[in-house]
């Protein structure tokens, strides 16, 4: 069945329940630790009071008051954790209710059958094994795509996908346009805040922006410490990437002595294979290769500083050879932004693994599914259309996705293969060919359209395909012209009005 059903939407939205579930587990473990810590602390303090019988009564009262205050603080923390747990559970309930609404928008196909059922098909005579539960029947029914409420439901889901994308892809540290959009929509639809884990995504985006834009390690270090136990079990390499970036930052700032001390404590252990588990040998090889370059980097910095100091003077021949060597340029590359890209990708990988979510934007996943069902071999693959080749060349020269000039892509004159559209003074509105979706649809598979809507199709020299009957029997308006053309062995394209010889037409067999 090609029509969407309730079951289809349940399957595609399972990831929406993973994050709240993981947050509940995480919060529960934190509460357990708080209780154990408080229990141990109170036990030790009470033991001290009991053990010292010679303590003055005033001091004992003071110690007991401290115990009461610490317990009150513990109660506040516990209440905060309980409230947090209730928020996470309310999100799961809201998402279940949101999916449950779909049961009201299905096509009612069994109403007539039930009313016309014969008396023989009574409950007593019916085979129980053949009876399907009503809930399962509702879930397998196709959705009524003409239902206004269902259209509004889809519109809400589209807004959620857009908000999700905007929050995650934000590149500004001062504001997040995705959160602003969510706040605006939630004023009229308060349930929106429970249908998306905006706070977690906002925290993710802040850490990512702090790494890739601000080159700041404080937020990613805090996130690592918060999730240290999971990352250790997952054999994460994030700690090494953080320490490696910290070391290179110290080198870049010129604090060589501090960098050497830092590397001895925080980087040297990663060179020992015995500190890795059997599943981490790939991390060991990668880390070891990076550590080998550290010593040469110090030499590079010394030679580079000396060369900069002697700009107006002649550089020694030996130093000149080193500076112009390919290996020297490799050390220079270590201090580029590649290290921050590597750290950001490592953070994304660990974040998605922690919460069991996809690294791709859900909006892109849905768009890809729709585009691949529309994509044909005629889409922007016409060899006469060179605009996309020009785009590829310009994109290779500037790979930064945030700073790329999109003026070329948004100009309507650059849309798709417009060979025939120009003749009609129209624009190609194919979404696959559109500049906005070109990059996303570029590597998608073609749609497998195995059914031809034409009877006895023929291809004209201009590439257009029509049923041969339509070419021989045009409308009454062009009947006299048709007879004249046929006597000359010619036919006219109904769309472009171009005239071709019948012998130049080719019988095609669409696959």
Swiss-Prot record:
What is this protein's function? Answer: Involved in the proteasome-dependent degradation of fructose-1,6-bisphosphatase.
The GO biological-process annotations, alphabetized, read as: negative regulation of gluconeogenesis; proteasome-mediated ubiquitin-dependent protein catabolic process
Cellular compartment(s): Cytoplasm; Nucleus
GO cellular component term of the entry, any: nucleus
For this protein, the record's Pfam families field holds:
CTLH
* Keyword set, alphabetical order: Cytoplasm, Metal-binding, Nucleus, Zinc, Zinc-finger
What PANTHER family does the entry give? E3 UBIQUITIN-PROTEIN TRANSFERASE MAEA, MACROPHAGE ERYTHROBLAST ATTACHER-RELATED
Q: Which stretches make up the CTLH domain?
A: 200-258
InterPro entries, from UniProt?
A: CRA_dom (IPR013144), CTLH/CRA (IPR024964), CTLH_C (IPR006595), Fyv10_fam (IPR045098), ZF_RING_GID (IPR044063)
* Similarity field: Belongs to the FYV10 family.
**What is the organism field in this record?**
Debaryomyces hansenii (strain ATCC 36239 / CBS 767 / BCRC 21394 / JCM 1990 / NBRC 0083 / IGC 2968) (Yeast)
Q: What is this protein called?
A: Protein FYV10
User: What ranges of residues constitute the RING-Gid-type zinc fingers?
Assistant: 430-496
Record region (Disordered): 117-140
Q: Name the domain of life this protein comes from.
A: Eukaryota
Main subcellular location of this protein, as a coarse class? cytoplasm
Per the record, the gene is FYV10
Membrane-crossing ranges are none
Q: Which GO terms describe its molecular function?
A: ubiquitin protein ligase activity; zinc ion binding
Q: Which lineage? A: Eukaryota, Fungi, Dikarya, Ascomycota, Saccharomycotina
């Amino acid at each position: 069945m090609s029509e969407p059903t309730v079951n289809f939407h349940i399957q595609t939205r399972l990831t929406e329940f993973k994050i709240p579930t993981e947050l509940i587990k995480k919060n529960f473990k934190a509460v357990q630790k708080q209780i154990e810590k408080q229990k141990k602390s109170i036990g030790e303090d009470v033991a001290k009071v009991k053990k010292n019988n010679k303590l003055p009564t005033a001091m004992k009262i003071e110690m007991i008051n401290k115990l009461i205050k610490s317990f009150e603080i513990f109660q506040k923390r516990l209440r905060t954790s309980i409230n947090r747990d209730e928020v996470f559970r309310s999100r799961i309930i809201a998402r279940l209710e949101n999916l449950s609404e779909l049961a009201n928008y299905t096509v009612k196909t069994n109403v007539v059958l039930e009313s016309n059922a014969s008396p023989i098909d009574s409950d007593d005579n019916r085979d129980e094994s053949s009876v399907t539960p009503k809930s399962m029947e509702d879930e397998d029914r196709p959705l009524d795509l003409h239902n206004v409420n269902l259209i509004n439901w889809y519109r809400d889901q589209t807004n959620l996908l857009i908000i999700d994308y905007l929050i995650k892809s934000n590149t500004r540290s001062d504001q997040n346009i995705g959160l602003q959009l969510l706040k605006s929509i939630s004023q009229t639809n308060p349930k929106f805040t429970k249908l998306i884990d905006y706070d977690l995504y906002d925290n993710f985006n802040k850490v990512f922006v702090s790494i890739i834009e601000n080159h700041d390690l404080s937020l990613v270090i805090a996130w690592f410490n918060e999730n240290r136990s999971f990352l250790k079990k997952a054999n994460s390499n994030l700690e090494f990437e953080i320490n490696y970036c910290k070391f290179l930052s110290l080198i870049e700032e010129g604090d060589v002595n501090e960098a050497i001390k830092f590397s001895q404590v925080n980087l040297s252990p990663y060179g020992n294979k015995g500190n890795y588990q059997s599943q981490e040998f790939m991390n060991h090889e990668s880390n070891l290769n990076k550590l080998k370059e550290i010593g040469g980097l110090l030499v590079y910095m010394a030679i580079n500083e000396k060369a900069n100091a002697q700009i107006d003077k002649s550089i020694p021949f030996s130093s000149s050879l080193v500076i112009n060597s390919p290996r020297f340029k490799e050390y220079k590359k270590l201090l580029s932004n590649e290290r921050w890209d590597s750290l950001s990708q490592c953070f994304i990988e660990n974040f998605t693994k922690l919460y069991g979510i996809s690294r791709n934007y859900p909006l892109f996943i849905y768009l890809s599914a729709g585009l691949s069902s529309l994509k044909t071999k005629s889409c922007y693959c016409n060899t006469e259309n060179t605009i996309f080749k020009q785009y590829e060349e310009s994109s290779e020269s500037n790979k930064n996705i945030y700073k790329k000039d999109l003026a070329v892509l948004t100009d309507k004159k650059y849309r798709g293969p417009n060979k025939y559209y120009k003749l009609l003074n129209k624009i190609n509105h194919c979404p696959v060919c559109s500049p906005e979706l070109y990059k996303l649809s570029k590597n998608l598979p073609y749609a497998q359209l195995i059914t031809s809507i034409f009877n006895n199709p023929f291809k004209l020299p201009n590439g257009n395909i029509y049923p041969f009957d339509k070419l021989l029997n045009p409308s009454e308006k062009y009947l006299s012209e048709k007879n004249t053309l046929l006597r000359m062995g010619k036919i006219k394209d109904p769309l472009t009005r171009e005239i071709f010889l019948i012998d130049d037409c080719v019988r095609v067999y669409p696959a």
